[in-house]
From Swiss-Prot:
It comes from the Eukaryota. It is found in: Mitochondrion. Belongs to the FAST kinase family. The keyword Ribosomal protein does not apply. This is FAST kinase domain-containing protein 1, mitochondrial. May regulate the stability of some mitochondrial mRNA species. The keyword Mitochondrion applies. One of its GO terms (cellular component) is mitochondrion. It comes from Xenopus laevis. The RAP domain seems to regulate mitochondrial mRNA levels. Keywords: Mitochondrion, Transit peptide. Residues 765-825 form the RAP domain. One of its GO terms (molecular function) is RNA binding. One of its GO terms (biological process) is mitochondrial RNA processing.
Length: 832
């Protein structure tokens, strides 16, 4: 029996060998080891080439290219070779005989050689693929979608057909590569329902994904970016896959992921730190323009000063060999780095002038914004840019492009525009989104200020244009009936237009759409309300109600955003205690998962509202945590770095003053002295005037001090001391500051008292003048940070008088006598 079995297997093997060797030409193709051998074989056997031979030859040519480093690939030479052209002609003639898999594979590989989408072979393959689409398997559909995406057909009916098929078979998809490829290509034609199904499917597949394939999660993150959908549970799974593969990533992959995270406003400190370290390791290994450009773009904004200088020196030696896209990437990175290397800026500006004519409008806008922010001193570049920008604006019929171009034109130094630009802006206003209108409002206001010499300015035309723009804004915002559209259009509005023109309409729309507020849009909605600086009780009550009810459905990372409007505006909703407790309990179990800077911001925001969860406070003021925070802040921009360090100091001060039982040490003395030194601006004329008024009221200039520094470095506008009979006490030494903690101690009732005490019954009085920033837009309710300062001053032993600048500058207080009477009443009749 065994002998018969062996004989049978041998017979079958011989049959297979004989069958495989019946196509000698295919056998010869399979043993080719270079493009030249393939072309030689094709040239000698054109008449004998079957559809199988053609497909195998094209696939083999791409295989050889793929195995080479990018810098050594010869795509252009292969594409222009006569035998490759012959292969394309043969393929076009044999399309109807191709198997489904072969058809898709040939289309995919032909596109790898940068064959244009309008090429007849590509068009015929696409049309045949469309005809066969319903019978394609999942792998073929996915690869076909990739081919369409590379031809910029994301919004085409054909892609819509693919999305419809995916909707029907999504439950059967079990391959993350197939799913992620489909997601990133059909994003432009899917419904919100299909989007959510795709996200859920990706979320489930990530649990079983081989983490070594980091391109799959990268495409998923790209899909989320394209959909503007920050779904954090899925993002975190993708991020975990990236963390496990950073050692295998090159600058290009790291640059792509960092860019995607920025677009999604997603930050993960562990990834940033590991990515920075990986990129620093590769600095000396990147010795060509392509790789060094990607390294510069990824590492530059995260690098320390020494590394930045090294990167700038390196990029300066390579800049002459850069193509237009690389120059644009470097310029954008320099802007993000706040680069001040004048030699590099000038060289980039000089090279850009050669390519301005080939950049798209959005790229021209990025260039203009960057060179303005970098303070470029190249008048010729500005002049060329203005001409090209105006030409693009006049020829464009896309409202978003017109608005974008108008905004950047107005940012150019001494820009003068002609009436055709104004006419174009006038014509597209009714079609503009709120974001577009905001950009145009900014541009028009700048043109008004520069006194544009045209009939639009001389006859009030620019004023009329601005009036029409405002009318369009009012009409558009009142017609919006979906809160997600409302948030999308207002998300990127910058400048004063929202505050000065649309604010009341925006709040009215919030009230009108209040029933559409859900746990899904709550964080973004809360951030918008914070931006408005408008205290609308019904809207804030709704936010608190939804958050309290559905807090378990909301990602813990969003807790800070939800709390923000309440603590900033100093508003406690009817269910205030339950709301704050729900938020606190929701986030406490996840402190180790939050980025360090977000933990600091969260703790500070709760401190504004007088909430000091011990677990949170102890987590912040921990040596290991502060070390992680320092490491993270090194990767931030200087502006964000300073902001977080300031919040940490303010939190440290609040805990020391309001929760001494926690025994958290004060460790910001040197930091505050540095801040004090940098901010030493002297006394303003208004302060000097009020100081004189106080001197007349109190009996002399030496009875009041100006710009007083307290323990823990609060600055008081004015200070005086009254005895138990409310009589002023003279300051013997005007130059002595009260910032020495060695002179104070804790007294009864939780107040700090000076060890060298005041006379019995005496009281320090702090007089604080609050400008408009201390109040919400629509009420006299004092905002959270100013109420915190008042609490702290009272703990330090002060009686605090907070005087509104609006009240001080009112018609009722328009004379010196009125000011003095007002101050006298506040100082001597307020209960001390």
């Amino acid at each position: 029996m065994f002998r018969w079995s062996c004989a049978h297997r041998l017979s079958r093997s011989l049959c297979q060998t004989r069958f495989l060797s019946t196509d000698p030409l295919l056998d010869q193709l399979k043993i080719c080891i270079s493009e030249d051998q393939v072309f030689q074989l094709v040239g000698k056997n054109k008449a004998r080439l079957s559809v199988t031979h053609v497909g195998h030859a094209i696939n083999l040519l791409w295989k050889f290219q793929k195995e080479k480093p990018r810098m050594l690939r010869t795509i252009d030479q292969v594409r222009g070779h006569p035998e490759f052209i012959a292969l394309r002609i043969l393929a076009e003639n044999k399309i109807e005989f191709m198997e489904d898999n072969a058809l898709v594979e040939i289309l995919y590989n032909i596109l790898r050689f940068s064959v244009e989408p309008h090429d007849s072979l590509v068009q015929q393959l696409v049309m045949e693929g469309w005809r066969r689409l319903e019978r394609f398997n999942l792998k073929e559909i996915s690869k076909f979608a990739v081919c369409l995406g590379e031809q910029h057909m994301h919004m085409s009916p054909l892609m819509g057909h693919i999305a419809s098929i995916v909707d029907g078979i999504l439950d059967d998809v079990q391959d993350a590569r197939i799913l992620s490829s489909l997601m990133v290509n059909i994003h432009g034609v899917i419904t919100p329902m299909l989007r959510d199904r795709l996200v859920d499917k990706a979320d489930s597949l990530m649990d079983t994904l081989d983490v070594s394939h980091f391109n799959h999660p990268r495409r998923i993150v790209q899909f989320l970016r394209n959909m503007k959908h920050t779904y954090r549970p899925l993002l975190e799974k993708c991020n975990n896959a990236f963390l496990q593969n950073i050692g295998q990533m090159d600058p290009e992959n790291l640059s792509i992921i960092i860019g995607l995270y920025q677009s999604l406003q997603y930050n993960n400190s562990e990834f940033r730190l590991m990515a920075r370290n990986r990129l620093i390791e590769m600095v000396d290994q990147c010795n060509n323009v392509a790789s060094y450009t990607k390294l510069f773009a990824a590492l530059g904004p995260m690098a320390g000063q020494e590394t930045r200088e090294k990167l700038e020196e390196g990029i300066l030696t390579m800049v002459d060999g850069m193509n237009p896209n690389q120059l644009l990437a470097v310029l954008g990175t320099m802007e993000e780095m706040e680069c001040r290397n004048t030699l590099l800026i000038a060289r980039i500006a000089s090279l850009l002038q050669k390519y301005l004519g080939i950049y798209r409008p959005v790229e021209l806008a990025r260039i203009t914004q960057a060179i303005v922010n970098l303070r470029c001193q190249t008048p010729e570049l500005f002049s060329m840019l203005q001409k090209i920008l105006e030409r693009n604006l006049k020829s464009s019929f896309i409202p978003g492009d017109v608005a974008m171009l108008a905004r950047v034109i107005s940012s150019l130094p001494a820009a003068r525009v002609d009436e055709e630009v104004f006419s174009k802006v006038d014509a597209i206003l009714p079609q503009c989104s709120l974001s577009d209108l905001s950009s145009l409002a900014l541009a028009i206001v700048k043109w008004v200020r520069t006194e544009q010499p045209s009939r639009y300015s001389t006859s009030g035309g620019l004023g009329n244009l601005l009036h029409k723009l405002n009318t369009c804004g009012h009409e558009r915002i009142t017609k919006i009936d979906k809160i997600d559209l409302f948030l999308e259009e207002l998300k990127y509005i910058t400048g004063d237009w929202l505050e000065e023109v649309l604010l009341k309409d925006a709040i009215s729309t919030c009230e009108r759409l209040i029933d559409q507020i859900t746990w899904k849009n709550l964080p973004e909605f809360a951030l918008f309300i914070t931006r408005t600086n408008y205290l609308c009780a019904p809207v804030l009550n709704k936010i608190a109600s939804v958050a309290t009810e559905d807090i378990t459905k909301i990602h813990y990372n969003a807790t800070y955003a939800i709390l923000l409007p309440f603590v900033v505006l100093n508003y406690e909703p009817p269910n205030g205690e339950a709301f704050f407790d729900a938020c606190i309990q929701h986030v406490l179990p996840h402190l180790n998962s939050l980025d360090p800077h977000l933990v600091v911001l969260l703790a500070y925001s709760l401190a504004l509202a007088e909430y000091f969860p011990e677990e949170l406070i102890k987590a912040v003021f921990n040596i290991d945590f502060l070390g992680r925070l320092d490491a993270q802040l090194e990767t931030f921009s200087s502006t964000l770095n300073l902001r977080i360090r300031l919040r940490l100091m303010e939190l440290n001060r609040a805990v020391c003053l309001e929760c001494p039982e926690f025994q958290i040490p004060w460790f910001h003395d040197r930091y505050c002295k540095q801040l004090q030194h940098r901010a030493n601006a002297g006394i303003s004329s208004v302060q000097r005037q009020i100081h004189q008024l106080l001197g007349e009221i109190l009996g002399g200039i030496n009875y009041a001090k100006v710009s007083v520094m307290t323990p823990y470095y609060h600055t008081i506008d004015f200070e005086c001391i009254l005895d138990k009979n409310k009589k002023p006490i003279l300051y013997l030494d005007q130059n002595v500051l009260s910032a020495d903690l060695s002179k104070v101690q804790w007294g009864n009732g939780g107040q700090l008292q000076e060890t060298k005490s005041l006379p019995p019954g005496a009281q320090r009085v702090a007089i604080e003048f609050l400008d408009s920033k201390a109040f919400s837009k629509n009420s006299s309710n004092i905002k959270g940070e100013y109420m915190m300062k008042k609490r702290h001053l009272e703990i330090l032993g002060y009686h605090v008088l907070q005087i509104s600048s609006l009240e001080w500058n009112s018609m009722e207080l328009s004379t010196k006598d009125a000011w003095m009477d007002y101050l006298r009443k506040r100082i001597f009749t307020d209960d001390l």
